[in-house]
């Protein structure tokens, strides 16, 4: 429904209105909306109805009921008059809630409850993030106190276990040569180029019976040719 700004209905939005229905009931509430069929929406609405007595000697009595938000059908509406100006506390409902009591606190938006003169709390230097802009704090400032020594010791232990190269002091020579199957011991000449070194018994097994034939131990004569099969 297109309604002009000069409409009388729009001028009474948020007013306290008295609406009388065909059956005699009276609804008093804050006028919030309407449509082309004159269907009304009232909030904080109260209903007043007159109850007829059973005997003619008794007077009529009026009964009040608190309803809250009400949608009135336009086909039942008889009259509509202004009851009062808009309430000042439009953001607070007039309908009392059961067991609800107002507290001493004040509702405020986030970030507006701190006075202007109070400085904002800041994080410690070791826990603060980098500064926005060109640069930030140094590495010493960013490292938490009491953790640098432990981290350095853990890194050194990890490097030694992983087999990192050991630094030898100057003047004492380099590391000893690796011992392998093809490398001769210190002080002995290796085999000439093109020849494989002789195969000896496996390490950890002493020469004796059941071992493969190889070079005899030093100081012992080799057996005769016919006696080699008996050993």
From Swiss-Prot:
Instruction: Give me the segments passing through the membrane.
Output: none
InterPro entries recorded: LSM_dom_sf, Sm, Sm_dom_euk/arc, snRNP-assoc_SmB/SmN
The molecular function terms in GO held by this entry are: histone pre-mRNA DCP binding; RNA binding; snRNP binding; telomerase RNA binding; U1 snRNP binding; U2 snRNP binding
UniProt keyword list: Cytoplasm, Methylation, mRNA processing, mRNA splicing, Nucleus, Repeat, Ribonucleoprotein, RNA-binding, Spliceosome
* Record GO cellular component, one term: methylosome
As for subcellular location, the record says: Cytoplasm, Cytosol; Nucleus
- Report where it is expressed, by tissue: Heart, and less in brain, pituitary and liver.
Q: Which residues carry this modification: Dimethylated arginine?
A: 108, 112
Modification sites for Omega-N-methylarginine: 108, 112, 147, 172
- The residue intervals holding the sequence repeats read 175-181, 191-196, 216-221, 222-228
User: Any idea where the Sm domain is?
Assistant: 4-86
SUPFAM superfamilies cross-referenced by the UniProt entry: Sm-like ribonucleoproteins (SSF50182)
**Family to which this protein belongs:** Belongs to the snRNP SmB/SmN family.
Protein name according to UniProt: Small nuclear ribonucleoprotein-associated protein B
- Write down the species: Rattus norvegicus
Its lineage reads: Eukaryota, Metazoa, Chordata, Craniata, Vertebrata
